[in-house]
Amino acid sequence: RKMADALPFGRARRDFWRDYYFAAGPRAVADGKTPVENALSTLLVDHQSRAARAGHIAFVGGGPGDPELLTLKARRALDEADVVIYDRLISPEILELARREALMIDVGKEGFGPSTAQETINDLLVEHGQSGAQVVRLKSGDATVFGRLDEEIDAVDAHGIGWHIVPGITSASAAVATIGQSLTKRGRNASVRFLTGHDMKGFADHDWAALARPGEVAAIYMGKKSARYIQGRLLMHGADRSTPVTLVEN
């Protein structure tokens, strides 16, 4: 413990103990106290001579909310994170999986409601990435679907911070699994559209005439408050009033 105190608190010290317990330690412990002390001393010198690890951002898809639907890679990223910057829709059960010492930052957004500005989120990513932290940017569903991912990647790229993407199960896939349906069906539809119910200007506009055609299938995200608007636009463009619609929440 006294040797590890020579290293700065946080990732450097955690890396030291990981290397000891999973490599140097097991090899030395069978030979007694002196080999263990020597192994600790040698490992400490090695870690003190290392350059500080660069910060890194993992853009992680948190899935639809059930922690059992997280990927193993997402679970590992949470376990190794120094900082977790998470969205409003991330469930408490998933947040519980983050490393206990991690700094947790809520950057929740809500359509037509209080939200953290995107510029603030970008600044947080850059700030913690430049500090050398391993950052998890935790987004609900899949990070690449309606998550403003490109803007955040551009922000960290502009400052030379490394990043990678961990995909997650998108809400549309989880929703149809819950109700025992599929997004595509032979003889019914050869394509499916992912749409958003609202954008930065308000209710989102789409190619309503195309969507109103028979056999079209769409998964509409963030569509609860815009449901009447969407219904009206589809009917205006000739949609059959008997077209089936399924609403899935939580």
Each model region followed by its residue ranges:
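Cofactor-binding loop segments of dinucleotide-utilizing enzymes, especially the Rossmann-like FAD-
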Residues: 62, 89, 140, 197, ...
